[in-house]
């Protein structure tokens, strides 16, 4: 058992930890770099430091998964000396030659350093076909502390148990919360104003780099469309993108309203998008698997059981709603 559990950080206060993190969430805003610490997620990774589990960072596109990984590596470098960090970013052409699971395995083994605590970080792991074979083999060697991130379409919560044979822990990253948005805009004290802004801009922090509403909206819309029209279509080989798009728009236009697959299929069919409740039920599951929507089931207090015939759905980020659905339409709908 060569993986050492590090205890030294337990005596360091949380405040001291975060003060030493210099590069947590870097964002270019108005021509300068602004930082914000996302304590909830970083603290979770610190808690899991040295455990045998594979740590899998999941979340919607552009929610900050890669930045979280980078921040944690900075934390390790600033707190421990006898460590060896093996970092692979498959978005970087420098790692093009190891986008094959045998090559990935060999590369990691070649960079292992005996006598040190070895950390393995793999960003955008899905770009290496059959990556799970390499990760599972490295996990079985019991000498690496492993962390991976990937596209939401390839690291779905429902698929993790199938992909990884060893123990794993999912660290789910959301877009900025309203609290984080306030901290990002700490120079503005009017919380009502900030809340109105946040309800429209949302928490996809990459959009804050743009000065105009049009550019911000285009950024968010592109993130959303990549998930719906590319990730899910590719993941599930869907034959009809129109039904998926109309379904997503319907759910966004009916946030927190009770609905069902039967009702949705009837409404879409009546509006020239023929479908059925089985397809709708399956597509809703796909959207939830990709972290675009979250479902809340009705609960029968008397019977103490969940009711299957109707649910409520909530969007992962309010900014997507305003970007994907006509802003004018939403305002008119909300004032009716």
Predicted regions, residues:
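Pre-Walker A adenine-sensing motif
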Residues: 37-49
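Hydrophobic anchor at the beta1->P-loop junction of P-loop NTPases
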Residues: 57
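Walker A/P-loop
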Residues: 66
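Short glycine-rich substrate-engagement loop in P-loop NTPases that contacts/grips substrate
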Residues: 88-112
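Structural recognition of the conserved hydrophobic beta-strand(s) that form the central parallel beta-sheet
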Residues: 145-151
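Interdomain motor-coupling "hinge/lid" segment immediately C-terminal to the ATP-binding subdomain
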Residues: 153, 158-257
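Accessory nucleic acid-recognition modules appended to NTPase machines
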Residues: 221-331
